[in-house]
C-alpha cells in the first residue's frame, strides 16, 4: 500500500473522484456544496478548520444580515428551516450620527415578509453542516488543507494533507480574500486596505429592539446595531486603525461605557456578552472570476467593506449563478 510522508505524517493514499472540488468550507463554499448536492453533482469540500471549532460560540463573533431574497434561496435549499435563533429585520434606520432625522426602510412598505434575517454565523454553519451530512453526493473533508494542485485541460488533481488525492473536473476557490487558488492562478486583483478596523461584539440590552437595525455614520466610520434574538444585538463598530487596538484593550467597564455612548439610551443599559473581536477592513476585487478549470466565489472573487452587510448575500448570488451553469451542463 502506498503511503505519503511528504506532509509530515503517514497516511494511506485514497483517490477520490468528483465533478467539483470546493476549496473553502465557509458559508459560501458550503452553500454551493448544498446546491450542487441537490442537483446530484458529486462534490468534495475541503476546509482547514474543524467543523466543531467553526460552530463554537467564541469562534469569530460574527453575524450576518441575510437579505430576503437570499433567505428564500436558503429556504429552497433546505437550509433556512434548520437555522436556529433567527431574528427578523423589520426596519432599517440609517442616520448621520445621533441626528433626529434618519433614512427609514420598513418591511410593510414592500410586503409582509421581513427585509431580512439576522443570524449568528455559527448557527448558519451548523445548519449547513447538517444539510451537507445528508447529501450522498457531497463529501466534506476537514480539517484538511490542499498541499499541491495541478490544473490541466483534463481536469484538476489535488493532493490533500491527509494523503488523499481528489480528481475533479472543476475547482472552486471559496478560500477567502487572501485566496491561495486565485494567487496561484495568476489572477490579479484590485485591492486596498481601508484606514479602519471593525470591532465586533454582541451586547445584551434592557429594552426591546423591535427588530430594527440601525446604521449610524460617525466620524470614524459606520456603527451598526443589528438585532439578534433574546434582547441582544450584534455591533459592528468601525474605528480608525490607529485607535482600534486601544479600544480593544480597555477594561470591560470602560469598553461598555464607550459602547453605551455610541448606542445611546434607546435600548436602555447595555452590557457586552462574550468576547470582542477586531478585523482589518479591506477591499479585494479579482480582475477575473474564472481561469482554466477554476472558478472563484465569495470573498475570493470580491471582498467588500461590511458597511452594507452584503458579503454573504453577494456570495449566495455567486452560488446561484455557478450552480445553474453546472446543473445545465450536467
Regions found by a protein language model. Name each.
Residues 79, 178-213, 223, 231-233, ...:
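Central beta-strand plus flanking loop segment that forms part of the substrate or channel wall
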Residues 37-60:
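Glycine-rich FAD pyrophosphate-binding loop
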